[in-house]
Amino acid sequence: YCSYTMEA
């Protein structure tokens, strides 16, 4: 996932 702007 991307934990900075898009989570999942």
From Swiss-Prot:
Give tissue specificity per the record.
Found in the liquid endosperm contained in green fruit of coconut palms, also known as coconut water (at protein level).
> Where is it located?
Secreted, Extracellular space
The UniProt keywords, alphabetically, are:
Antimicrobial, Plant defense, Secreted
GO biological process: what's one of them? defense response to Gram-positive bacterium
Give a yes or no for keyword Secreted in this entry: yes
Q: Which GO terms describe its cellular component?
A: extracellular space
- Describe the protein's quaternary organization and the partners it interacts with: Monomer.
Q: What does this protein do?
A: Has antimicrobial activity against Gram-positive bacteria B.subtilis (MIC=257 ug/ml) and S.aureus (MIC=274 ug/ml), and against Gram-negative bacteria E.coli (MIC=302 ug/ml) and P.aeruginosa (MIC=259 ug/ml).
This protein is called what? Antimicrobial peptide 3
Q: Which organism is it from?
A: Cocos nucifera
